[in-house]
């Protein structure tokens, strides 16, 4: 009797929710695209985003059958990433050599621009954004710039922390610059 009760409980807890879950079925379609530089998809979603050879961001909400440009993104983008910790809804679009980037929290339905207040020497570098695994609003920006000073290559970084992009605060960390002689 206890065994039957345990099996019934297991069925109710594990199998019943799986039977009622919405089915995600990946679909592969062929679409004529001239050039594509970067193609990513959100986790468990039919939404895909790609960059063309000119840095224009295209989005498809139907597994690549139809594509449209993202109107909110005005600049040329050089890299797009899906957040590794919040990949079902969040993505980042980065502008080359700029502290400005775009973020979406709804699989590309809407976009907002954020700017990291990096110092002038970092304007020719790039910033990489990381989020906290449990706190989605916590953004960490690592901005770097390669500078040559008297035949020595410096690879300094500036680290910024933000609560959902408002505002980014610079962290003053006690580390030394990494030097490489040319």
UniProtKB/Swiss-Prot annotation:
Gene Ontology terms: cellular component: fungal-type vacuole; membrane
One Pfam family hit: Sortilin-Vps10
Highest taxon above the source species: Eukaryota
InterPro entries (UniProt xref): Sortilin_N, WD40/YVTN_repeat-like_dom_sf
Start-end of each BNR repeat: 58-69, 102-113
Keywords associated with the record: Repeat
UniProt keyword DNA-binding, yes or no: no
Gene3D superfamilies: YVTN repeat-like/Quinoprotein amine dehydrogenase
Protein name: Uncharacterized protein YCR101C
Origin species: Saccharomyces cerevisiae (strain ATCC 204508 / S288c) (Baker's yeast)
């Amino acid at each position: 009797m206890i065994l039957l009760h345990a099996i019934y409980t297991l069925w109710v807890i594990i199998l019943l929710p799986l039977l009622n879950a919405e089915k995600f079925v990946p679909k592969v379609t062929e679409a004529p695209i001239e050039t594509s530089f970067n193609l990513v998809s959100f986790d468990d979603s039919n939404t895909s985003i790609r960059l063309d050879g000119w840095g224009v961001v295209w989005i498809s909400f139907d597994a690549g059958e139809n594509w449209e440009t993202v109107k909110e993104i005005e600049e040329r983008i050089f890299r797009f990433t899906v957040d590794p910790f919040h990949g079902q809804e969040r993505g980042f679009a980065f502008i080359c050599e700029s502290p400005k980037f775009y973020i979406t929290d709804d699989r590309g339905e809407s976009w907002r621009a954020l700017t990291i207040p990096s110092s002038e020497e970092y304007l020719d570098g790039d910033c990489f954004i990381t989020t906290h695994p449990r706190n989605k609003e916590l953004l960490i920006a690592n901005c770097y710039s390669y500078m040559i000073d008297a035949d020595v290559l410096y690879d300094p970084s500036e680290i910024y922390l933000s609560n959902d992009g408002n505002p980014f605060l610079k962290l003053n960390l006690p580390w030394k610059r990494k030097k490489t002689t040319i």
